[in-house]
Design a protein with these regions (language model features):
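Patatin-like phospholipase
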Residues: 11-14, 22-118, 156-159, 168
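A motif-centric signal for short, conserved binding hotspots located
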Residues: 381-432, 441, 449-454, 461
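Small-residue-rich anion-binding loops in enzyme active sites
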Residues: 1-18, 27, 144
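Active-site gating loop/helix substructures
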Residues: 91, 129-216
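Extended hydrophobic secondary-structure segments that form protein cores and membrane-embedded regions
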Residues: 14-17, 51-60, 133-139, 194-196, ...
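Conserved small-residue
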Residues: 20, 62, 115, 136, ...
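Hydrophobic, mid-to-C-terminal alpha-helical segments
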Residues: 204, 208-253
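C-terminal helical/tail subdomains of lipid-metabolizing enzymes
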Residues: 202, 223-225, 237, 262, ...
Length: 461
């Protein structure tokens, strides 16, 4: 049963897939390579990514791929369907008058028919045909809230959303403003909302939100963080090289600026997610964020690596594509960024395959996260709760430490993370020079002042 897999202890593996329209073909190039390497690693030529990843999440085009993988399709099968879908979905534009008056370029019916054919009557709550954890990100337009729709039965809103057909949720995730009309969904409680592309938010790259979904107590998964406990693989759709000159910007019209805004936003959202994920993780694929931050290799938040993290993506620049042996004109490079041009699919597929061959390495996937690795139990203990364990009484050995009362609130960065202390608490220095904080009352109950070894006054007061 799926629910047993979601509740099972042990290391967990997450897959996060960006939005990006037709550029999802690039994503599939990376996924084919990952699936091939993992199949070799597990000795199974028929290996599926649904067998490896315990939770797969996606936004917009990423939600189509995520759902296909979650029902057990191989990446190559999804790519074949993508090529069939692309021309139908983005083939026939609405007239310019329709675009001006109604605000969308494409008829959503071809997308609906294609997704219905793809996923049939599978609902979000189908615990048999959906083989792994699945999360689809969309945005509710009238409340401005980003929704994570997932299939864990213990979720707060699972009973209200479980009957929604996958094809309909995916349409909601992919209903990009100016491209398609919003999708209206009504849940089992009778609440009806208008939903648009999840990419119109910070979750166009959903990696950080997927990490929170896996670990926060507000959500039902409750997976334990740690670089040996969680692996998150994040895959992009490729990005345009947006660098330009002052002269070009001086000539940009109002419509030109308006057309560029989605790309600006998606770029910033992706950079922010990338920065947060590298700050939280151990990552062999860490990229330079900017010239000042570098790749954040030495900057770990609270001195704790909350997960292992892999990020695969490519910039459509002459430099990066040239390194792969792909030479394109400036006009063609600029055209690759379009999210709705099916004529780009062949070259995008080639870029994805070659980029993956170069970037995705077998040793990125540690044996710690091998599917057949013997499961080790990971327990999270929390202060304030009681546990039926055979506790025994112990007395601390007489190991001298140094301590100093601090008259104001303070923080201490320790190997375990950041400690918070209040005014009057003690800053303690241990025998190895390590610092930690000790509550004033606990300090008085635990320690007594002694002469400093070798004379010179007391070492604790």
């Amino acid at each position: 049963m799926l629910v047993e897999r979601l509740r099972r202890a042990g290391p967990k593996r997450l897959l996060s897939l960006d939005g990006g329209g037709i550029r999802g073909v690039v994503t599939l190039g990376y996924l084919e390579r990952i699936e091939q390497l993992l199949g070799e690693k597990h000795g199974d030529p028929n290996f599926r990514l649904a067998d490896y990843f315990d939770l797969i999440g996606g936004t917009s085009t990423g939600s189509i791929i995520a759902s296909g993988l979650a029902i057990g399709l191989r990446a190559a099968e999804i790519k074949d369907r993508y090529f069939a879908l692309g021309g139908k979905i983005f083939g026939q534009k609405k007239g310019f008058l329709n675009y001006l008056t109604k605000g969308y370029k494409y008829d959503s019916k071809p997308l609906e028919y294609a997704l219905r054919d793809f996923f049939g009557d599978i609902a979000l709550g189908d615990q048999e045909r959906i083989r792994t954890g699945l999360c689809i990100f969309t945005k509710r337009a009238e409340t401005f809230s980003t929704w994570a729709l997932f299939n864990h039965p213990d979720g707060m809103f699972y009973s209200q959303n479980r009957d929604w057909p996958l094809w309909q949720i995916i349409m909601a995730s992919a209903a990009a403003p100016t491209y398609f009309i919003p999708v209206f969904l009504e849940d089992n409680a009778g609440d009806r909302g208008a939903f648009i592309d999840g990419g119109i938010s910070m979750v166009n790259n959903p990696s950080f939100r997927l990490f929170l979904l896996a670990c926060l107590q507000s959500y039902p998964f409750h997976w334990v963080p740690g670089k040996d406990n969680l692996l998150l693989v994040s895959v992009g759709t490729g990005k345009s090289d947006q660098r330009t000159s002052n002269e070009v910007l001086k000539k940009k019209s109002l419509l030109g600026w308006a057309a560029a805004m989605p790309e600006y936003f998606m770029y910033d959202a992706n950079q922010m997610n990338q920065m947060i994920m590298q700050l939280l993780s151990e990552s062999p694929t860490a990229r330079v964020i900017d010239s000042e931050l570098g790749n954040l290799e030495k900057e770990k938040y609270l001195n704790f690596e909350a997960l292992s993290y892999l990020r695969y993506d490519i910039q459509f620049s002459a430099k990066e594509l040239g390194a792969l042996g792909i030479e394109l004109s400036k006009a063609k490079l600029e055209a690759l960024g379009a999210m709705d041009n099916p004529d780009n699919m062949e070259i995008l597929a080639s870029i994805g395959a070659k980029a993956a061959e170069s970037a995705v390495l077998a040793d990125h996937f540690s044996d710690t996260f091998h599917v057949n690795q013997s499961t080790h139990k990971i327990t999270l203990f929390e202060t304030g709760k009681s546990y039926p364990l055979p506790f025994q009484f112990y007395v601390k050995r007489e190991i001298p430490i140094e301590a100093c009362e601090i008259g104001h609130p303070f923080y201490v960065m320790t190997m375990e993370g950041l400690m918070h202390a209040k005014a009057g608490d003690y800053l303690v220095r241990g025998i190895h020079g390590e610092y930690y904080a000790c509550d004033r009352e606990i300090f008085y109950k635990t320690y007594s002042a002694v002469e400093r070894p070798g004379g010179g006054g007391s070492s604790a007061s």
